[in-house]
Swiss-Prot record:
GO terms of biological process kind: translation
PROSITE patterns: RIBOSOMAL_S13_1, RIBOSOMAL_S13_2
Record protein name field: Small ribosomal subunit protein uS13
One Gene Ontology CC term in the entry: cytosol
Region entry Disordered, spans: 95-123
Pfam families: Ribosomal_S13
Gene assigned in the entry: rpsM
The keyword rRNA-binding is annotated on this UniProt entry: yes
Top-level taxon of the source organism: Bacteria
Family indicated by similarity: Belongs to the universal ribosomal protein uS13 family.
């Protein structure tokens, strides 16, 4: 089983897809990694040689911020926005959409479930 960046890649999947299990690596970045390291994207993870796994591991380690470091960086960026009190920071603090979406009717995912307001119904 190939273990890269602390993640066990699924054995039966193609390497191209298996790399996307690592936080911070999507399908395009996965293709770029495989192209640069010279590994065939159609190879199954279980069929990778130890040398290929090490090549991929080294390339990712040198060129990308992934997993815990990326999560920490994102959390610190959000914390900084909240602390300086900018518009985006205020939106994060209030749990509202940050990127300019309308909130009158939508944004349920970000705002959470509806809360009932007592005394509103007409009798």
């Amino acid at each position: 089983m190939a273990r890269i960046a602390g993640i066990d890649l699924p054995k039966e999947k193609r390497v191209e897809v298996g790399l996307t299990y690592i936080y911070g690596i999507g399908i395009n970045r996965s293709r770029e990694i495989l192209k640069e390291t010279g590994v065939n994207p159609d190879t199954r993870v279980k069929d990778l040689s130890e040398e290929e796994v090490n090549t991929i591991r080294d390339y990712i380690g040198k060129n990308f911020v992934i997993e815990g470091d990326l999560r920490r960086t994102i959390a610190l960026d959000i914390k900084r926005l909240v602390e300086i009190g900018c518009y985006r920071g205020i939106r994060h603090r209030r749990g509202l959409p940050v990127r300019g979406q309308k909130t009158k009717t939508n944004a349920r995912t970000r705002k959470g479930p509806k809360r009932a307001i007592s005394g509103k119904k007409n009798k």
